[in-house]
Amino acid sequence: MAHRLALVTLAATFVLILFGGLVTDTGAALAVPDWPSTFGYNLFFYPWSQMVGGIFYEHSHRLIGAAVGLLTLGLAAALWGAGGWFRWLALAAVVAVVAQGVLGGLRVVLLEDTLAIVHGSLAQAFFGLLSAIAFLTSRAAERPLRDPGPSLRALTLTAAVVVYLQIVLGALVTHAGWLALHWAGALAVFAVVPVVTARLRRSSGADAPPMASVLLGLLALQLLLGVGSYLGRFSSVWIPGEQTTMLVLPVAHRLVASLILGATVVLAVWVTRTGPARLERARTSPGRTAGEERSQGAPGSGHPRSVAASRTPGVTAGEERSQGAPGSGHPRSVPASRTPLQ
């Protein structure tokens, strides 16, 4: 359940970033001068017939933001029920989405470009957080890679940080024209991320996440979009369909940046969670989960072994529970196994 809700919230946030880009690049950020109301109307009751021009982009952005907020609350409730460190993720998501809504409103009221930069940067950080949550609540999170070693763990974390800083520099280009730093950040991204993907392929072999290959394609696309955005805004080069093209290119550039950030965050989390002890458990106990391993205790330790330890090979916990005791007469059924958060 939590995994599906995380995916829906992630997709809604992606659409929210899309409309945020449209608001910025069409100059519609101040099309609606008041907040939290819309021309005096309640946010949810503003007439659709009056949503034209910049008002359409700005008010749609607010409505989608409200939807993301509600989805985040639902996701947080699901994560909270899972307990453990999932509760910290739930708390972080709620704090981030509330802060993001307040920043967006203050941007309208105070007319500060600094708030716009922080608002855009936090939106991408929130997308990265949701990407991590979607991964951690999936079955893929239970499949460890081959031990990547400390250097690759540090490198994947560095890649995620560098990509995020480059996104912040992109916001500075949009609102303050800081182009030189953004080009320098692009060089850093293209220096680090391809190395990460190459190292993952070499160290993990067939276990390498497909996302590592997807990252290279996203980087190539991002380079083309970045060059196109630069030519349209900072040069006199003629571009076909200039008005439409110069709206599409920067918006697409921002969206692909979100995907790159999400991918690098997921890779960083995946690699960081893959440690030698976890890999050893996976190799010596095929088919068992980490929870089963922990519950069994060491051989000869005197601790009682859980049901999972005496389970027939290939039979999952869900199947054990559904079969009943031998000779009990209860019908045997074999439901599909699920992780607690799915």
Residue spans for each PLM region:
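N-terminal signal-anchor transmembrane alpha helix
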Residues: 2-29
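Membrane-interfacial loop-to-transmembrane alpha-helix junctions, especially the N-terminal start
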Residues: 4-6, 83-94, 151-157, 206-215
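Alpha-helical transmembrane segments of multi-pass integral membrane proteins
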Residues: 12-13, 95-97, 151-171, 218-219
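Interfacial helix-loop-helix junctions of multi-pass membrane proteins
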Residues: 23-32, 98-121, 172-181, 226-258
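Extracytosolic (periplasmic/ER-lumenal) interhelical loops and adjacent juxtamembrane/interface segments
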Residues: 24-59, 241-242
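Individual transmembrane alpha-helix segments
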Residues: 49-71, 175-179
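Hydrophobic cores of alpha-helical transmembrane segments in multi-pass inner/ER membrane proteins
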Residues: 68-74, 123-139, 185-197, 254-270
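Long, intrinsically disordered low-complexity tandem-repeat segments
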Residues: 289-310, 314-337
